[in-house]
């Protein structure tokens, strides 16, 4: 047995499923998950000494590549002054200044510890601010594992084949209205059914938890218009897309102004950080200035703030997003060419530094219904054969892939060559 297999066997005796987040268990592809010993740049190194070109990037945060020296040194320096104080620090102020500068729609920001905390808190704030209970989300979109959001969710829920999680009371779920991504008619119908009851829409501006689905040109502006018409708030969940699709997020790329924005992943540089923010009048409804309660023992802790500040400072440097976008486009185009050469039907969606691979005869993949028609069994074979070639992709047909600026053109070409070889075997 390999060392990964031995560790996985031991882990399953102590940790449910052997992992601390379900998709890591390779449930979506079968087999034994890799146990990682270290990572550097664009590469992962497992406990058995094998190296892999990594397109998971810790599920999105590693836009600069793994073990970036600026972030690492910032963490070391901060740790020497103490790990957590439970009191305000100067770095929290600097971080808030930087985030609100980079994302102009955020007048104020509150730091939390995860993307789930960010979306959960933003929805509570929207409900408190509007005095309404219902929310609109989209089929196949994942916004963390808060109870009200685990209704027809994407990501791990799709991987497990469970659109709704047991343990979510029907009384909670009844306030969540689910519409079709990229279909404004379903959203208008929901509003017209409950014209005075919808507090907010929450949406991934690029759906990254049913693989990678960009919005149609009229979709996000249409959501903004509907929120204005019916007096609801628009929450854009940029946990995945923030600082990756563009410096100011997908909202700037697609030119839409939300009332609230949720951030995660890149904002922490690899440390557990989330944030939510937006209009000043809405944010001032939060405790202690307002009645909507939200708190966290480790929120804004000095280690995470130091890592996040260092990461965002680097990400804001000129040329970063142009490089990220160019590398992603090179990979996507190369995969499509290799698939065409070998007669494999393939769609590759991409925007900014994220991409999605779909085995399908369809010409486009634009919504949940398109995604679930794709050939999952072929993806499973593709995943394992690519792993043998030293390429680590997301271990699920329903997860997006992530590029970093640490990837080289040589890494991209090696990946395309590996895919060409693998496509010929499918």
Swiss-Prot record:
GO terms for cellular component: cytoplasm. InterPro entries: 4pyrrol_synth_GluAld_NH2Trfase, Aminotrans_3, Aminotrans_3_PPA_site, PyrdxlP-dep_Trfase, PyrdxlP-dep_Trfase_major, PyrdxlP-dep_Trfase_small. The modification N6-(pyridoxal phosphate)lysine is found at residue 265. GO terms for biological process: protoporphyrinogen IX biosynthetic process. Its cofactor is pyridoxal 5'-phosphate. It comes from the Bacteria. Its EC number is 5.4.3.8. Transmembrane segments: none annotated. Keywords: Cytoplasm, Isomerase, Porphyrin biosynthesis, Pyridoxal phosphate. Pfam families: Aminotran_3. This is Glutamate-1-semialdehyde 2,1-aminomutase. It comes from Enterobacter sp. (strain 638).
